[in-house]
């Protein structure tokens, strides 16, 4: 599962396009994150989406913050996801658990049921994060009632741009293929290196300790 997570995060890189408005840049980030989240949910792995989607959403918030002039740490981005996610997630965890159970019984069908919901949830979190940073810039409050309203409107609008089931499943297969290909390549490289090291093992007397290039403390 870790190779798949790394592949997902590697595929979600974003540079702010100065030719676009902040709103347009944010739209690209949110849609990309939501599509990747839906693809993860389409994977026939029980509860995989619960484990993989949070790191993706954290990276989404990092990107949105950067677009609005905020350089925040991953730890702070995670806190924002948890804070805003609490507003969005009433009942979501229970539904995700039930969908995880569905994947145990009917892996492919369970994944296809989950993908649209996770897409909408991630899209709503992205939109709520966007308003969160906009309010930070202007110094306006953004309490729970306002967060809930923004999230509800975003969930509704996400249905109009929802990708097809084949879009989710095709991307999921491609991510899985790349992750497996990369893992296989790394295993082969490690095996070749180990074989080379065993053939040319240095004599103990020739090994000298190197001083660190910078202080370790």
Regions found by a protein language model. Give the residues of each.
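Terminal, membrane-proximal amphipathic helices
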Residues: 1-40, 56-80, 84, 88, ...
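Short hydrophobic membrane-inserting alpha-helices and related fusion/pore-forming segments
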Residues: 38-52, 96-118
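A generic, lipid-embedded transmembrane alpha helix
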Residues: 87-98
């Amino acid at each position: 599962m870790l190779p798949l997570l790394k592949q997902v995060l590697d595929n979600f890189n974003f540079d702010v396009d100065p030719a676009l408005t902040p709103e347009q840049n944010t739209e690209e980030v949110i849609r990309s994150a939501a599509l990747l989240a839906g693809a993860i949910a389409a994977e026939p792995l029980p509860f995989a989406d619960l484990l993989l989607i949070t790191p993706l959403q954290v990276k989404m918030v990092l990107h949105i913050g950067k677009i609005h002039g905020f350089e925040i740490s991953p730890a702070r981005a995670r806190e924002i996801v948890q804070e805003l996610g609490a507003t969005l997630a009433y009942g979501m965890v229970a539904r995700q658990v039930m969908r995880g159970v569905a994947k145990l019984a009917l892996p492919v069908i369970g994944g296809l049921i989950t993908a649209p919901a996770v897409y909408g949830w991630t899209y709503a979190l992205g939109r709520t994060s966007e308003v969160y940073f906009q309010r930070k810039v202007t110094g306006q409050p953004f309490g729970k009632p306002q967060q809930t309203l923004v999230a509800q409107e975003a969930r509704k609008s996400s249905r109009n741009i929802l990708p097809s089931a084949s879009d989710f499943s095709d991307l999921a297969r491609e991510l899985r293929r790349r992750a497996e290909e990369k893992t296989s390549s790394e295993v082969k490289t490690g095996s070749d290196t180990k074989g080379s090291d065993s053939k040319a093992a240095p004599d103990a007397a020739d090994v000298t300790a190197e001083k660190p290039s910078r202080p370790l403390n």
